[in-house]
């Protein structure tokens, strides 16, 4: 019986890792062992940062809403605005509110006025 070698399989596995490491600096894109480590670390960062991205966007939306609310009404703060929205029964999430504040300031001002009337 012929000896089974895994040349094609090993080559394909190495090629997959080295293709993933394309563009990395120095040996990280050329040497299989260091490329494997670099790709593994990159995947760890990617997994972690998918979770972090959600937090960052929520913080950004809150900052934008706060700035827009204060621009419309100097007395109103973000927390008072959110409480007033809940009291008014307006169920709009922060992403939509931030988008309104940036792209349609008149509509956002109307929402602020409606929330203030309910508060």
UniProtKB/Swiss-Prot annotation:
- InterPro entries, per database record: Ribosomal_bL20 (IPR005813), RIBOSOMAL_L20_CS (IPR049946), Ribosomal_protein_bL20_C (IPR035566)
Return any one Pfam family short name. Ribosomal_L20
The UniProt entry, under PROSITE patterns, shows: RIBOSOMAL_L20
Q: Which GO terms describe its cellular component?
A: ribonucleoprotein complex; ribosome
- Top-level lineage group: Bacteria
Q: Which GO terms describe its molecular function?
A: rRNA binding; structural constituent of ribosome
Q: Which GO terms describe its biological process?
A: ribosomal large subunit assembly; translation
Keyword entries, A-Z: Ribonucleoprotein, Ribosomal protein, RNA-binding, rRNA-binding
S-S bonds: none
Q: Report the PANTHER family cross-referenced here.
A: 39S RIBOSOMAL PROTEIN L20
Task: State what this protein does.
Answer: Binds directly to 23S ribosomal RNA and is necessary for the in vitro assembly process of the 50S ribosomal subunit. It is not involved in the protein synthesizing functions of that subunit.
Question: Which family, according to the similarity comment?
Answer: Belongs to the bacterial ribosomal protein bL20 family.
The cross-references to NCBIfam families, in alphabetical order and at most eight, read:
rplT_bact
Protein name as it appears in the record: Large ribosomal subunit protein bL20
């Amino acid at each position: 019986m012929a000896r089974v070698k895994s040349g094609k399989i090993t080559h394909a596995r190495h090629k997959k890792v080295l293709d993933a490491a394309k563009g990395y600096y120095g040996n990280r894109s050329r040497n299989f062992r260091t490329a494997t480590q670099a790709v593994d670390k990159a995947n760890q960062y990617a997994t972690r940062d998918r979770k972090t991205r959600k937090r960052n966007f929520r913080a950004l939306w809150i900052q934008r809403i706060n700035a827009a609310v204060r621009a419309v009404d100097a007395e109103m703060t973000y927390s008072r605005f959110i409480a007033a929205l809940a009291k008014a029964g307006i169920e709009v999430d922060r992403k939509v509110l931030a988008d309104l504040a940036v792209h349609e300031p008149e509509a956002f001002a109307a929402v602020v006025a409606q929330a203030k009337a309910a508060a």
